[in-house]
């Protein structure tokens, strides 16, 4: 078959598919109107940089997992606040029945506009999520958490009844159904997940997430969040040092990490990240315990500098802008080097 005949055959096949399934159901990748992936900020400057596109991608499934009290819900509330700032409508499926509206408000969430549901069963939770996503009016939906999505058969059964893999089957079926709607409506769907220990693992990590393997495959981004230390004011613990690792990323190179402080009552400390990343990228100068910006001393000690940046938002925003610009250039250089190595 000659090239001309091949082109004619492909054109005829494409025309037939479009006739059957509608315009835009099949096309060449270069003909797509939006090749760039849109993103919503996570509320953490370091994590936005680690994700490579400035936040979590729209129209994708995201999994955030980690041990208890590691900051999973805090991170998702920051995500909601950032989406709402852009005019987005968000929904929270609270399967754990544990959302604190007062804390959400402190983190910048407009609770008057947040749609919330506290379902009784896993099936009910996922049906509600499916209906909201299909409506095309929701920009972000949070499901907290996969472990709390208890199948109806388990709730109606007796205590101690063996329910082998019923939750994994439920998740697998739901994700098959949800994934096309999520992509079509450009809705960010975030699943919060817990960690369990596998019994009898001799080599490698014994940790695993709940709900089977389906979510691991369907998720475009998987974020592992851990508490690595405490922040103290004299003897009082006022926050926790947190480390996140992007363990899977389909939109940018994976395995990048970010560190930030979660302050009790106010969430992720943006000022702390600006100081740390500013010093790392030589934007902020550090000499002993003194910090300087543009040869002007802005404070002694990290906590004092954080307070200074809170009181001077224009300087904070200026440093953040430079950090984002510098980081994107570094990412582009790294990507170019990787492509050259592959060639």
Curated annotation (Swiss-Prot):
A GO MF label: ATP-dependent DNA damage sensor activity
GO biological process, one term: SOS response
PROSITE patterns per record: RECA_1, RECA_2, RECA_3
GO cellular component: cytosol
Record InterPro entries: AAA+_ATPase (IPR003593), DNA_recomb/repair_RecA (IPR013765), DNA_recomb/repair_RecA_CS (IPR020584), P-loop_NTPase (IPR027417), RecA-like_C (IPR049261), RecA-like_N (IPR049428), RecA_ATP-bd (IPR020588), RecA_C_sf (IPR023400)
Subcellular location(s) of the protein: Cytoplasm
Residues at which ATP binds: 66-73
Main location: cytoplasm
Keywords associated with the record: ATP-binding, Cytoplasm, DNA damage, DNA recombination, DNA repair, DNA-binding, Nucleotide-binding, SOS response
SMART domains (alphabetical): AAA
Cited NCBIfam families: tigrfam_recA
Family stated for the protein in its record: Belongs to the RecA family.
The protein's role, per its UniProt record: Can catalyze the hydrolysis of ATP in the presence of single-stranded DNA, the ATP-dependent uptake of single-stranded DNA by duplex DNA, and the ATP-dependent hybridization of homologous single-stranded DNAs. It interacts with LexA causing its activation and leading to its autocatalytic cleavage.
Cited HAMAP family: RecA (MF_00268)
Designated name of the protein: Protein RecA
Native species: Rickettsia conorii (strain ATCC VR-613 / Malish 7)
Record lineage: Bacteria, Pseudomonadati, Pseudomonadota, Alphaproteobacteria, Rickettsiales
